[in-house]
């Protein structure tokens, strides 16, 4: 993973080097699109189209943006924004905010073998506004192979135990 990755920056100079603390995640940089499906005991199963973007500004984190819309009619479904950090070798942290009033800090393991990146994360902190649904447990699994990103999300919410909620397969569209 010794590749240098650059990104346009809003700061003078315009292009910045990837911070060495997150160089192990360089292969994630860019835009990914694909399809996923969701289910939960309290809702009808659904399918969605997704776009995920990983970027950087030369600091020790990646920026993360996620947007989904319904396959059936294109209406917006969900969004997340946040940051990915590598505090130590083999460790990863995600700091995420949802427009539904939920924030989460997930921590876990990071494994890089050849061109494959794997992350196993569990929420250590979940914050909620007074009007947000009762989400009390979250965990995620990510696997990135060259130009292919898959993930699953497990959730415990509204009186239900932690269980499968989402799965998606995305393909790189822009580095």
Regions found by a protein language model. Give the residues of each.
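Polar/charged side chains located within well-ordered beta-strands of beta-rich proteins
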Residues: 64-66, 80, 140, 151, ...
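Acidic, glycine-rich flexible loop segments
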Residues: 101-102, 120-139
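A short, structured loop/turn motif at beta-sheet edges
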Residues: 53-60, 85-90, 109-118, 142-148, ...
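Short hydrophobic/aromatic-rich beta-strand segments that constitute the beta-sheet cores
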Residues: 34, 62-66, 92-96, 118-123, ...
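Helix-adjacent hinge/juxtasegments
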Residues: 71-111
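Amphipathic/hydrophobic helical signal segments and adjacent flexible N-terminal regions
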Residues: 2-61, 69-76, 137, 145-146, ...
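Short, solvent-exposed aromatic-acidic interface loops
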Residues: 67-72, 97-103, 126-128, 154-159
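A structural detector for short beta-strand units
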Residues: 50, 80-82, 104-106, 138-140, ...
């Amino acid at each position: 993973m010794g590749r240098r990755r650059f990104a346009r920056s809003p700061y003078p100079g315009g292009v910045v080097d990837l911070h060495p603390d997150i160089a192990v995640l360089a292969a994630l940089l860019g835009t990914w699109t694909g399809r996923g499906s969701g289910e939960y005991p309290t809702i009808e199963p659904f399918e969605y189209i997704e776009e995920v973007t990983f970027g950087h500004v030369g600091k020790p984190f990646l920026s993360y943006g996620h947007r989904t819309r319904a396959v059936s009619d294109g209406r917006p479904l969900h969004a997340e924004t946040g940051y990915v950090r590598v505090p130590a070798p083999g460790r990863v942290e995600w700091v995420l905010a949802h427009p539904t009033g939920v924030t989460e800090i997930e921590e876990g393991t990071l494994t890089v073998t050849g061109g494959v990146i794997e992350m196993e994360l569990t929420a250590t902190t979940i914050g909620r506004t007074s009007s947000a649904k009762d989400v009390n447990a979250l965990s995620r699994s990510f696997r990135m192979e060259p130009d292919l990103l898959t993930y699953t999300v497990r959730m415990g919410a509204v009186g239900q135990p932690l269980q499968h909620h989402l799965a998606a397969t995305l393909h790189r569209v822009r580095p």
